[in-house]
Amino acid sequence: MAESNDWLSVGKIVAVQGLLGELRVNPASDFPERFTVPGPRWLRSRQGGEPSEIQLKKGRQLPGKSLFVVRFEGVDNRSAAETLVGMELLVPADDRPELAEGEFHLLDLVGLKARLTADGPAIGTVSDLISGGNDLLEITTSDGRKLLIPFVEAIVPEVKLKAGWLLLTPPPGLLEL
């Protein structure tokens, strides 16, 4: 049985698109080929469990949106597609595109400590990523609050993966929301 860390979540199926079995995927990956290049992918239900393999037939990004529309083999109508809504789209954890120096995979940010100064204490830990118009980091503080921080260079100017932390320079009031 495969462990959960054997898999990399690249998106979540959020809705059906049309009548022919197409599905909308909210990506958790900066690599569009995860949703456009045919080949094997895996699905895992909301309850967890063992992922099941499915073949991606084709995909495209919706113009002006971060969502992708995908077609899977054997999913040819709306009813079949509706059974997949809410599932996580996975690839094997070792299926990671090569990155240039200084680049990183967004999912590698989960678990990093968030600091306000390079040598200061952590104010919390990155607990999730939320994809949308702009990516958001969900940071869970030591008292259990959840902060949503825009993942933009002006607010997150440094990411130190090997050291296990990132630097925040939030505008006044952002941490109080």
UniProtKB/Swiss-Prot annotation:
Transmembrane segments: none
GO biological process: ribosomal small subunit biogenesis; rRNA processing
GO molecular function term, any single one: ribosome binding
Listed InterPro entries: PRC_barrel-like_sf, PRC_RimM, RimM, RimM_N, RimM_N_sf, Transl_B-barrel_sf
Protein's UniProt keywords contain Cytoplasm: yes
Cell location: Cytoplasm
UniProt keywords, alphabetically: Chaperone, Cytoplasm, Ribosome biogenesis, rRNA processing
CC terms in the record's Gene Ontology section: cytoplasm; ribosome
Superkingdom: Bacteria
Positions of the PRC barrel domain: 101-174
Family, per entry: Belongs to the RimM family.
Domain-level remarks: The PRC barrel domain binds ribosomal protein uS19.
PANTHER family in alphabetical order: RIBOSOME MATURATION FACTOR RIMM (PTHR33692:SF1)
Record's subunit section: Binds ribosomal protein uS19.
Role played: An accessory protein needed during the final step in the assembly of 30S ribosomal subunit, possibly for assembly of the head region. Essential for efficient processing of 16S rRNA. May be needed both before and after RbfA during the maturation of 16S rRNA. It has affinity for free ribosomal 30S subunits but not for 70S ribosomes.
The protein's name in its UniProt record: Ribosome maturation factor RimM
Species for this entry: Synechococcus sp. (strain CC9605)
Lineage: Bacteria, Bacillati, Cyanobacteriota, Cyanophyceae, Synechococcales
Gene from which this protein is expressed: rimM
